[in-house]
Amino acid sequence: MRNEEKPLVSISNLNVKNLSSKFGLGPEPHVKGVLEVMYKYKSAQKLEENGTQYQWYISDSKDGSYTKLQGIHGKTIILLNDYVGKYLKCEVTAQDTQGNKAKTITSAPTSAVLYTIGNPLTDWFYEARYGLSHHLLKEFIERDFTPKQDQWDANKQTWSQFIDQFDVPKYAKQVNETGAKFVLLTLNQNSGYYITPIAAYDKYMRKAGLLGNEPNPMTSKRDLPLEIINELAKYGIKVMLYHPSNPPHSAHWKDKDFRVTSEVFHYTPGQNGAPGDTARQLVNEFMAELGERYGEKLAGFWFDGFYKEPAAVYNNMDNAYNIADFASAAKKGNPYRIIAYNTGWDKQFHKSTPYSDFSSGEDPNLKAIPSEGRFADDDCQKMLWGVLGSMDNPVHGWGCPGTSKETNFVVNCAKTVTSRGSVLIMDTRVSVFGVLDPLQFAQLLEVKKSLYSK
């Protein structure tokens, strides 16, 4: 072939790699594992790869006819029970930043996907028995129930300066004293203010014309989750992160104008509507960025708001950024990361999506009692999540000071729930200074005694 006929873009050494070799999920592909298509990319013009297209196919036999897996169009694929006994391969069309495409190439088929008993990804979660959660959120900090000294005064401090006050070593020491083996920490809910820097957020803020070269005022310069992850790791305590399934619906640039919600996220101002393509894309990009940054240090994600309207668009596999894409983004950087999607208070112990590793468990009253056994629907670890704080407020006690339950009730709940194979998360207020609510801390010490004393 003459030089002028050489393709501008090409790929070689195409193969499918099993990213999940631990916990009995390899070397053959197993349910709960993650596969990734690998190849060597080459551009004659030295341009970066951008916009490469992927499509996975499935067959009942290795040499049989393959059909397209609807909506499975990412570089990775999470293996589901539906794939057991079947063979997979991936079609790749590489592309550069100018839209030049390589010849489409298809990988060799994998070996048959094998069944996995239960869910070994959640073994650590089950063995932990109980953990804490915190609602460190701007919209909660502004509530009347937050002590005045803990509130943010935007006229005196930037959001970043406010978050800088968190004393991570002091906080980690207290958490360890409670006996909790993991923490679930909020990243953001509806305000659009994050406790960590996010490059993708900056990019889309600038694209919307709301931000120049200055730092994003709605994120902290400090990577608070990473600091907490590293400090808690010294005590053997893991960290998971909370984020809604949708973008923030009440993110204002100023004077409650909803401009960040509408112009950056293209989302429904003031309500949890169905997120459109752009809204889902941004959530995917945010989670993938954070997941890749934290890698195996980040143990899990709990996604809120997977209610009727958002679930409908995510579960439509004809859509871009569907539930398969969302789950793959959440496992970016760690194929063993566990995830859950919350469908509401009335369904604490069920598998809300095919990709759920543990149940959403939400019940602020801590009165939902699981049936015996670890798993819902064979492989979804059961979990109950409720509050310790005062419930005399519009937020049902989440992130609130004081107590709403007698200590004996809390202790008995912990013993009952964990004895049945479920995991328990207790929402505990933490101040911006990294201090746990003293009344709740006292209750947690009693929980520790009941669960771990011989």
Where are these regions (language model features)?
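Ser/Thr/Pro/Gly-rich low-complexity disordered regions
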Residues: 1-115
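Mature catalytic domains of secreted/periplasmic carbohydrate-active enzymes
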Residues: 115-454
